[in-house]
Amino acid sequence: LSGGTHQLTVNQRPLNATIQRVYDGGLNAEGSNLSSFDALQGGETLFLSGTGTVSNKNVSSNQSVTLGSLALSDAGATGDTANYSLNNAKLNIVQRPISTVYLTKLYDASTTVQASDLQAMTNLVGSETLTLTGTSTISDANVGVKTVNTGGFTLNDQAGANASSGGLASNYILSGGTHQLTINQRPLAATIARQYDGTKTAAGSDLSSFDALQGGETLTLSGSGTVGDENVANGQGVTLGSLALVNGTGLASNYSLNSASLNITKRVLNSSGSKTYDANTDALAGAITLSNLVSGEALNHSGTATIGSANAGSYTITNLAGITIADGSGGTASNYTLTGGTHNFTVDRRAVSVSGTRLYDATTNAVASDLSTH
């Protein structure tokens, strides 16, 4: 071999490129979206510049690329483009992740999200649209910004869409996007009810009901507000003051106290009285004393009530309709009622006097036949 010529020709190694990108509605295969080469040697790296094209814009795998201006580049790479040639390229178009925003709703104690709650889809290509069907969920029902689990939803094609125009559901995917639902506090109107007490206070402890609690939940009310009139009335608007919602079986943070009204009902009076046996069942107003009046208030009353028996004993006054109450010192009759109270009346035994006369008989005996009562 000595003295001869000995030559080896090293030819360029052909490379096949794989390009991958998210669906964008176009036919381009950009070198900047290079995924891999099939035959780089010795751990070398190369890049791809320029643009090629494919014939189908839709999601697909291994579409043949018309190379166009695609070219190998070694700028910043460890390999040398002189050692390689670009033989062909394939393009993988993968589904485009989209995001969804749902209509803000008031707290409703539900973790269900309906497709009909959809407000907007974002990250769609151009003028393409899709529709959404199905039912899905959020992790909890409480107030806040929630991430929607989209597993129960289905994307549907735009009406009239085909392979060349319009939105195709197969080109998109919900996974990888952001999916948010905002839940706001539900406003509540409280009804407070109490008997007349001579004040303008509306205490939370006198709560009667809320108008819009969800899912059978309960709340209570603390603090107090005020009204403009202390007298019996329905639906007086309350200045809320320190009134505040308190957790019950539900969370107060899921609600807001929007308004309150106060119903002041008549104060129930009690009564008691007594008389000496008089052989009738009348209970005269003059023998009856009223109680449970607001401190500092008095009423006048007149008429006749009825008890169950004329005989001596303790009774309940049964016919209060015969007693009329009227305004008195500081007291307004319309703020009171006798209905519903306790009304007791006692008939006491009547004392009987005895007298009599007889002729002197030298004894101390008083014989009954000589006596009379009066």
Question: What is the role of each PLM region?
Answer:
Residues L1-H374:
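Short loop/turn motifs that initiate or flank beta-strands
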